[in-house]
Amino acid sequence: MLNKSLHYLTFFSLCLAFLFSSGLHGQQTKGVNYREYDIESLQALMQAGDLSSRQLVEFYLERIEAIDRNGPQLNSIIEINPQAIEIAAALDAERQKSGSRGPMHGIPVILKANIDTADEMETTAGSLALKGHHPPVDAFVVRKLREAGAVILGKANLSEWANFRSTHSSSGWSSIGGQTKNPYDLARNPCGSSSGSAVAVAASLTSVAVGTETNGSVVCPSSVNGIVGIKPTLGLVSRSGIIPIAHSQDTAGPMGRTVKDAAILFAAMIGEDPADPLADIFPDSLPDFVGSLSKDALKGARIGVYRGHSGAGVDARVDRIVEDTIATLTSLGAEIVDPIEIDTEGMGKAQHEVLFYEFKTDLNAYLEKSGAAINSLAGLIEFNETHSDTVMPIFGQEDFLEAQTKGPLTDEKYLNALANAKRISQSGINNALKNNKLDALIAPTRGPAWLTDHINGDHSSGISSSSLAAISGYASITVPAGHVVGLPIGISFIGGEFSDARLIQLAYAFEQASKARKPPLID
C-alpha cells in the first residue's frame, strides 16, 4: 500500500509513471552510471525528462545486488524496501502532473535500521530479538522525508543496538546483518554505529542516508568511509520513532558524499515534533541551510584548532592532514587560533553514568510503546542468553547487564552525572568560542580505519573528537580532509548550540577548495 504522502495518486497517474520510466526516456539513460552523481545533478536530469526516479532506484538496486550482496559483499544494506520501485513510479507521475515537491523529490534514501517505518520493512536495530518488528507508525523524520518526496530505498546494517550492547563489540556487526565492510579496504572496519549508512553512501548504493548518533555514530563512520556527516544540534531533528540509547544525546543525522547533499537531506529532516521532549527549544525560524552555501564562507572566519581531543599526537600522518587543513583554511581567508585547550576532566565518567541510566529507561519506553514482542531490557537480556549461539557468537552483552542495574532517572547519582556532563561540555565549547571570538573549532574526526577483529573487538588508534559536541548536544560536521595509506580521514567543524548552518557553510567552503574526497575503487 502506498504511503499517504503520495496523496492517493490515481491509477492513471501510476500508468503515466510506468510509461515515463520505461519508454523513450528509459532508452536515453540505458547504460548510464549514476555513481557519484549529486542530488542537484540528478534533479536536473529528472526535470529535463532524461531520468526517472524509478530508473534511479533500479540503478541503485542493481548496484546493491552487484557489490553489496555479491562481489566484494559490502554487506551494508540489511533490507530493501519492496515498495521502492512503486513509490518511485508514483513520484515520477506526480512530477509529470504537478511538478516537483522540492530537491528531495524522487531521491532514494537509506535509513539506519533503528529508525521506525510503518511499511513492509522491519525495525530491528540489527538484533534478532526484534526480528519481525513492525512499528505502527513512521518515525517523525521518516514522515518528513516522505512529505519531501524522498524514496525510502531500504535500511542499513549497523553496529547492533547502535553499539550499546558490549564493551568488546565489532563496529558494523549485527546478529541480523553480519559484518559490514569498509569499501576502501574490505579487511578494515567501517566504524559505527551508522556503519551501513556510511558505506552505502560511499559506495554509491544510494544518493544519501540517515544515521543516528549518541557519541560519534554519524561522524566516525562518515570520516572513515570518506563522506560528509552532520551531527545536528539536539532538538533540530526529532527522535520520535528511533530506537534510543540516551535522550540527552541521541539525534539522527544526514550523510552524503558532498556537503550540499548532506545539507539538502538535513533541511528535509528538520521539523518541530510535539512528541519530542525537546520541542520547546525548536527555533522560531530556520536558516536556509542550502541557499546560504558559499565558497567564500571562510573569508574572515576565526577558526580554533582543538588540540585536546582523544588520541591527540598519536599519529603523525593524521597530524599532517590537520596541518594541511589549517593551510587550506588560511588560504581561504580564515584566521587561525592555535591551540585551543578545553578542560574536559570528568566529562567521560559523567557521560558513562548518564548513558547507562537513560538507556534502560528510554529503551523500555520505546519497546512498550512500539508494540515489540519483547518489551523490556530484561526481556532482551533473557532472549540473548537463550539464543547466545546466534546473537552473541563474537561478543556479549556487558552494556545491557550494566544498564539493567541502574535505577530510575530520579536517582541523585544520575541527576548529578547529567548536570556535570552538560556543564563540562557546554561550558567548554561556549568559553572557547566566546573567549577567542571563534566561528568554530576544528579537529580530526577519527584516525584511519582499523582492521576488523572479531576476537578482540574494535581497536582504533584512539583519535576521536566527537565527545564535546555529542555530550553538549551542540552541532558538528565532518568533511573529508585527506588520506592515510588510501584510508579517508575527516576533519570536524564543531560549534555552539544551533550553529549548524554556519558549520555547514564553513565545511562547504573547505570542501570546495580542498576537494579531498576520493571515491572508493570498488565495483
Protein language model annotation of sequence segments:
Residues 1-12:
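Bacterial N-terminal signal peptides that target proteins for export
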Residues 10-20:
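Bacterial N-terminal signal peptides
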Residues 49, 106, 112, 147, ...:
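Glycine-rich, small-residue loops and helix-cap segments
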Residues 125-127, 181-183, 193, 243-251, ...:
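Flexible glycine/proline-enriched surface loops and loop-helix/loop-strand junctions
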Residues 66, 151, 202-304, 309-312, ...:
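Structural helix-boundary/capping segments
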Residues 105-125, 291-307, 357-424, 478-488:
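Short helix-loop capping/hinge segments that flank enzyme active sites or metal/cofactor-binding pockets
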Residues 29-215, 233, 300, 433-435, ...:
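Gly/Ser-rich catalytic/binding loops embedded in alpha/beta enzyme cores
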